[in-house]
């Protein structure tokens, strides 16, 4: 009777098992392989890198446009007919997808670092394709439907590029450990040269990126202009329902420079404040008068409009995620808000703030279609509100407006040639923050034209515009921006130059050190060991050399351990092949103790 014990025993490799198991479901030792990665799996790795780049760009873009989330929701409301905050779910989904892809990429890089064969599991491949397709569709949709918003990406880079550059240097320096390992393992000089040239071309490209960075916040502190004046967009819509008395009062409590309002005229000729064409979003008209829900707000009498509640929607939809922060008294006050008339706003703001007024055209069959401008002007003049504090944005019949109210600040909402602006006696421009460059701001200032930019909610954007010298901004988030004491960062050019040159030198020194260390660690390794000879779960091409090497390792351990029979002591090349084929599914396992040799014990009874 013959009893056999295992030829070898290997210690468990939990980290390696988790690495290959999570990435390719290769949890067992015999499933892992140090063979070269197949071309197909290399293609999947390339696809993984591309997906990572796209999801990173998309996530950064979606974070960058958080200043315009309300605008995005408003756009979808006009398309879909009901209000919902889509921005946060998209942000959460994008972050989750990026985290998943980043995790797969880290696992793949770890495979390369330890010399394991890449074999992405089919479930991960499906997830990769779904995320890639979804990201491409999302980016294409934004490019077609929200094209101007891509300019926000470039604007945000003016504020973040100096710091993203430092992060990129950290990443490329860490990646050099893997590249240096591949360089050290490469046996051909041509392969080493290719790896070296390609990697350092990328590295030096990263080092020179700061030469292309231009930011208004890279400036001398003494050149920083005054803080931009703040204009409350429809009051303070993050603290109270927009276009209500409470909203304007909250804005005035912050001592803002001005208030912005959209003026509509009722069926019986009363100017009131409303941004939407209908009343569905900002009132309870669907509950109180369902038959009037889709009728234009301008086609209702003021007596009907006064009966509507203009505050409950704010608590229900919570458009800015701020309703929970209201005090109990503010919560009760919000529930009792009604539509605000122009006369109420004029009385509230008189002597306290300037007004940026925009008129909305009534429907074609409105009785005041031809005279709504005169009615509005008369209401402003009758209130006694100081004319020099009114910024008049409505672009039609400006000669009539200048005649009736010569003190108004004529404000244009479009970019035009300077000759046309002067011809129209334009004193101020009201533009979206993506429509004007730093150089254009300087040009307008030299022409004695003041510029107001809308809608600026994020502190980073406010800081960037502050450094650029913007005179004033319109904001939903005035209560936060009013407390910003200075730009989030400002750096003299000399200090910035010193910072990025120092960072480049440190990175380069570390990379050289890593290459030297990896060459010293791995450059002399040319022999096989039992840990590096494993069978792959995938079908591989047969290799006579590998089979013979396995047999040599096994029989060298047998000869060192105990005596064996003559039948096993002499092996020809053909016996190697026969034995290898018979044991093609067996994998040796590592030593029980580090540095110990595997032992074989063969006991034969009757001999």
Swiss-Prot record:
InterPro entries named in the record: GP_PDE_dom, PLC-like_Pdiesterase_TIM-brl
GO cellular component, one term: axon
Domain of life: Eukaryota
Residues modified by glycosylation: 301, 336, 352, 374, 448
Regulation acting on activity, per entry: Inhibited by high level of NaCl or urea.
Expression sites by tissue: Detected in brain, lung, heart, kidney and testis.
PTM entry text: Intramolecular disulfide bond between Cys-25 and Cys-571 is reduced by PRDX1.
Record bears the keyword Iron: no
Expression induction: Up-regulated during neuronal differentiation by retinoic acid. Down regulated by high NaCl or urea.
Enzyme class: hydrolase
EC number: 3.1.4.2, 3.1.4.11
Keyword RNA-binding belongs to the record: no
Gene responsible for this protein: Gdpd5
Protein localization: Endomembrane system; Cytoplasm, Perinuclear region; Cell projection, Growth cone
Cytoplasmic side of membrane: 1-42, 111-125, 182-192, 518-607
Assembly notes: Interacts with PRDX1; forms a mixed-disulfide with PRDX1, leading to disrupt intramolecular disulfide bond between Cys-25 and Cys-571.
Family from the record: Belongs to the glycerophosphoryl diester phosphodiesterase family.
GO molecular-function terms, A-Z: glycerophosphocholine phosphodiesterase activity; glycerophosphodiester phosphodiesterase activity; phosphatidylinositol-4,5-bisphosphate phospholipase C activity
Role this protein plays: Glycerophosphodiester phosphodiesterase that promotes neurite formation and drives spinal motor neuron differentiation. Mediates the cleavage of glycosylphosphatidylinositol (GPI) anchor of target proteins: removes the GPI-anchor of RECK, leading to release RECK from the plasma membrane. May contribute to the osmotic regulation of cellular glycerophosphocholine.
UniProt protein name: Glycerophosphodiester phosphodiesterase domain-containing protein 5
Main location as per UniProt: membrane
Membrane-topology annotation of the record: Multi-pass membrane protein
Annotated region described as Disordered, given as residue ranges: 582-607
Extracellular side: 64-89, 147-160, 214-496
Organism of this sequence: Mus musculus
Reaction it catalyzes: a 1,2-diacyl-sn-glycero-3-phospho-(1D-myo-inositol-4,5-bisphosphate) + H2O = 1D-myo-inositol 1,4,5-trisphosphate + a 1,2-diacyl-sn-glycerol + H(+); sn-glycerol 3-phosphocholine + H2O = sn-glycerol 3-phosphate + choline + H(+)
């Amino acid at each position: 009777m013959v009893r056999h014990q295992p030829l070898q025993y290997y210690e468990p490799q939990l980290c390696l098992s988790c690495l290959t198991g999570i990435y390719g479901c290769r949890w067992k030792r015999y499933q892992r392989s140090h063979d070269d990665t197949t071309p197909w799996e290399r293609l999947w790795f390339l696809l993984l890198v591309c997906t990572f780049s796209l999801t990173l760009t998309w996530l950064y873009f979606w974070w960058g446009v958080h200043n315009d989330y309300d605008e995005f929701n408003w756009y979808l409301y006009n398309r879909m007919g009901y209000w919902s905050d889509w921005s946060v779910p998209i942000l959460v989904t994008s972050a989750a997808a990026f985290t998943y892809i980043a995790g797969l990429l880290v696992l793949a890089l770890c495979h390369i670092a330890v010399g394991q064969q890449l074999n992405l599991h089919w479930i991960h491949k499906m997830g990769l394709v779904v995320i890639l397709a979804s990201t491409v569709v999302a980016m294409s949709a934004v490019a077609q439907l929200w094209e101007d918003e891509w300019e926000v990406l470039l604007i945000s880079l003016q504020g973040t590029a100096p710091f993203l550059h430092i992060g990129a240097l950290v990443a490329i320096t860490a990646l050099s450990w893997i590249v240096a390992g591949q360089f050290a393992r490469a046996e051909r000089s041509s392969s080493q040269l290719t790896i070296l040239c390609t990697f350092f071309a990328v590295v030096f490209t990263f080092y020179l990126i700061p030469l292309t960075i231009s930011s208004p916040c890279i400036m001398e502190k003494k050149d920083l202009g005054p803080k931009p004046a703040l204009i409350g967009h429809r009051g303070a819509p993050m603290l109270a329902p927009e276009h209500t008395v409470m909203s304007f009062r909250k804005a005035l409590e912050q001592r803002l420079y001005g208030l912005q309002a959209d003026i509509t005229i009722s069926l019986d000729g009363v100017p009131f404040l409303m941004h939407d064409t209908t009343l569905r979003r900002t009132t309870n008209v669907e509950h109180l008068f369902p038959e009037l829900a889709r009728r234009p707000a301008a086609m209702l009498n003021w007596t009907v409009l006064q009966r509507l509640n203009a505050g409950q929607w704010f608590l229900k939809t919570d458009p800015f995620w701020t309703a929970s922060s209201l005090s109990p008294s503010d919560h009760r006050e919000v529930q009792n808000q009604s539509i605000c008339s122009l006369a109420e706003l004029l009385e509230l703001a008189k002597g306290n703030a300037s007004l940026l007024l925009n008129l909305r055209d009534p429907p074609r069959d409105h009785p005041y279609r031809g005279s709504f401008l005169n009615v509005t002007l008369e209401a402003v003049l009758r209130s006694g509100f100081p004319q020099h504090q009114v910024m008049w944005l409505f672009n039609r019949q400006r000669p009539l407006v200048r005649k009736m109210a010569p003190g108004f600040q004529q404000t244009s909402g479009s970019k035009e040639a300077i000759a046309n602006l002067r011809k129209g006696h334009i004193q101020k421009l009201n533009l979206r923050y993506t429509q004007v460059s730093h150089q254009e701001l300087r040009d307008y200032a030299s022409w004695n034209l003041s510029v107001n930019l809308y809608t600026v909610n994020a502190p980073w954007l406010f800081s960037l515009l502050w450094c650029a010298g913007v005179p004033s901004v319109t904001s939903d988030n005035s209560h936060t921006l009013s407390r910003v004491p200075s730009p989030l960062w400002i750096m003299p050019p000399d200090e910035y130059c010193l910072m990025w040159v120092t960072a480049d030198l440190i990175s380069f020194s570390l990379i050289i050190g890593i290459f030297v260390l990896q060459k010293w660690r791995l450059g002399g390794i040319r022999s096989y060991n039992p840990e590096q000879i494993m069978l792959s779960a995938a079908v591989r091409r047969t290799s006579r050399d590998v089979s013979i090497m396995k047999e040599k390792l096994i029989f060298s351990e047998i000869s060192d351990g105990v005596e064996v029979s003559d039948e096993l002591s002499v092996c020809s090349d053909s016996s190697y092949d026969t034995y290898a084929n018979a044991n093609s599914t067996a994998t040796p396992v590592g030593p029980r103790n580090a540095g110990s040799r595997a032992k074989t014990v063969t006991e034969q009874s009757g001999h």
